[in-house]
Regions:
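Structural recognition of the conserved hydrophobic beta-strand(s) that form the central parallel beta-sheet
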Residues: 92-95, 147-152
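Interdomain helical connector at the RecA1-RecA2 junction of SF1/SF2 helicase-like NTPases
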Residues: 161-254
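SF2 helicase catalytic motif II
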Residues: 110-150
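ATP-dependent helicase/translocase motor core
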Residues: 1-46, 55-71, 87-91, 97, ...
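Short glycine-/polar-rich loops that comprise or flank the Walker A/P-loop
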Residues: 43-45, 71, 116-117, 144-147, ...
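Residues immediately C-terminal
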Residues: 56, 98, 126-127, 156-157
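Conserved catalytic network of the ASCE P-loop NTPase/AAA+ motor domain
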Residues: 40-42, 84-86, 111-114, 140-145, ...
């Protein structure tokens, strides 16, 4: 259904499409099917698949996208962090940040014309592709003539990061609850565990210094500060210990996400 609705929307001339599918329900395979149908029909000949982590690109290339092997390439560094786009391929795999030049260097995506790609699929588009100030947005705006498909499990509607504004309302939604009811996903249980510094906050002793020898600002650090403004080494050990203990209690080889 997701494939049909996406292809139908594109056939109607819709240039931005959003597909929402819960984690573990087959977003990547759905992306493959969409690309396969549009590429085979000749509707889309040059395709760019964007992700934010190498493991997602590498895994996708050897698994779901394996049938594209003969005409698929990954945009990688050719030396000193410089990326090169070989125009002879048809399906391109890339990390968002690899297409945006490092400070003082030109953006690699400028090597090709704005109409080079016919189709761009943005994996995990909630991670920032729709932010006005995002580097990823530069890529999407440059290739604005291409049909752009955003795929996510968690659409955002935050100010400045609203992928509903950018891609439009989803043409298809497959929720976590639906996945559980259909038997594709296992039911889950939320276990809440709290550490004293998360609940009560933490205030350094007067004159206390950090690991770099700098004096820590004297104030109450609350939950939202921990992990951002400061890191408490002992807290990490406590978290690791509790997670390890939980895995031993429930069976350390139990399948989880």
């Amino acid at each position: 259904i997701a494939v049909d609705r996406t292809v139908e929307a594109i056939a109607r001339g819709q240039q931005r499409v959003l597909v929402v599918m819960a984690t573990g329900t087959g977003k990547t395979f759905t992306a493959f099917q969409i690309i396969h149908r549009l590429h085979k029909s000749g509707a889309k000949k040059k395709i760019l698949y964007l992700a934010d982590r190498n493991i997602l690109i590498d895994q996708t290339m050897v698994q779901d996208f394996k049938p594209f092997k003969k005409f698929m390439t990954k945009i990688t560094s050719v030396g000193e962090g410089e990326e090169k786009i070989d125009s002879s391929y048809e399906v391109y795999m890339a990390l968002y940040h690899q297409l945006v030049g490092k400070e003082g260097k030109p953006d690699p995506f400028l090597e090709v014309q704005p109409n080079f790609f016919d189709l761009i699929i943005v994996d995990e588009c909630h991670r920032g592709s729709a932010k006005d100030d995002s580097a990823w947005r530069k890529v999407l705006e440059y290739f604005s003539s291409a049909t752009q498909i955003g795929m996510t499990a968690t659409p955002k509607a935050d100010e400045g990061a609203n992928n509903l504004d950018y891609f439009g309302e989803p043409v298809y939604t497959y929720s976590l609850l639906q996945g559980i009811q259909d038997g594709f996903l296992a039911p889950y249980r939320v276990t809440a565990d709290f550490i004293n510094v998360d609940l009560q906050g933490w205030t350094p002793d007067e004159g206390e210094i950090d690991l770099l020898g700098k004096e820590i600002e004297q104030k109450l650090y609350q939950r939202q500060n921990i992990g951002r403004d400061l890191a408490i080494k002992l807290r990490r050990k406590v978290v690791a210990h509790r997670i390890t203990q939980m895995l031993y209690d429930i069976g350390r080889m139990t399948k989880t996400i």
